[in-house]
């Protein structure tokens, strides 16, 4: 199998968050006995996993940065990073972040510059600056592109070079539905049918070097292609999940924090009103829908930054407390603390 990786990534944004580390990369490095994998990141980590754990025999990475300032920081011994991650990653991560932030001050952002700790060629990958060369005869095309609006212009340059039946994936910078539309608008539905092109995601749901997981979107690829990618993901990433394409963003992107809170609220509310109060599921669903729709409508009407002006968070303290029983009692006390801090 040939894997084409389009976009090598840059560590500066990972370092800037102040919370990421190389836990997964170190784990894989130890598993396969290749320390140089320990400080890979982004698509390079996922490419190494697919090569070493899933048997992908050809990996090509395409990025214009290879003709520019692709910078490899070699201040840290891979073995030291691995050992630190066995105990506490924060024993070494502050120094790594400090160095990255220092280098980033002088280095241009992608595609003019990028920060890495291992060169892809040292992992047995081929490199190129030509996306068309990379995708030629590729079975699996993993894209790691800038934000969504820039992607049509990039994709249109190589779309005609994708072989029939190939799997093409995106990550965190675009929804699957919009990603599919780029291909559909170029060639129409006939050419984007599964026998011609399988559009889905290989979304890590976090920085790949930190967590071993991948989320695969269903709806725009054949069942066979989804199953193939799922099996690869299980071998390479350790944990793989299939979900409807429409849910990929809410589950995997930064709004996942809100999705998690909302989903936990729905589930505990449902159990409280149906199991304790004995309300029919249909009635519980109707009330839940009203809550979600009206809060969304309020946000749309006044803006997320002005919601408190229309609905005082304190208004819920004297009403929701009457529902503080059953499963809802698992989360409501913490919710009340948050609302109390924000009431007018």
UniProtKB/Swiss-Prot annotation:
Under catalytic activity, the entry for this protein gives: 5,10-methenyl-5,6,7,8-tetrahydromethanopterin + H2 = 5,10-methylenetetrahydromethanopterin + H(+)
Pathways involved: One-carbon metabolism; methanogenesis from CO(2); 5,10-methylene-5,6,7,8-tetrahydromethanopterin from 5,10-methenyl-5,6,7,8-tetrahydromethanopterin (hydrogen route): step 1/1
Q: Which InterPro entries match?
A: 6-PGluconate_DH-like_C_sf, HMD, HMD_C, HMD_C_sf, HMD_N, METHMP_Hmd, NAD(P)-bd_dom_sf
Q: Which GO terms describe its molecular function?
A: N5,N10-methenyltetrahydromethanopterin hydrogenase activity
Which GO BP annotation is one of this protein's? methanogenesis, from carbon dioxide
The role this protein plays is: Catalyzes the reversible reduction of methenyl-H(4)MPT(+) to methylene-H(4)MPT.
- Could you identify this protein by its name? 5,10-methenyltetrahydromethanopterin hydrogenase
Q: Which organism is it from?
A: Methanothermobacter thermautotrophicus
Mind giving the lineage of the organism this protein is from? Answer: Archaea, Methanobacteriati, Methanobacteriota, Methanomada group, Methanobacteria
Q: Which gene encodes it?
A: hmd
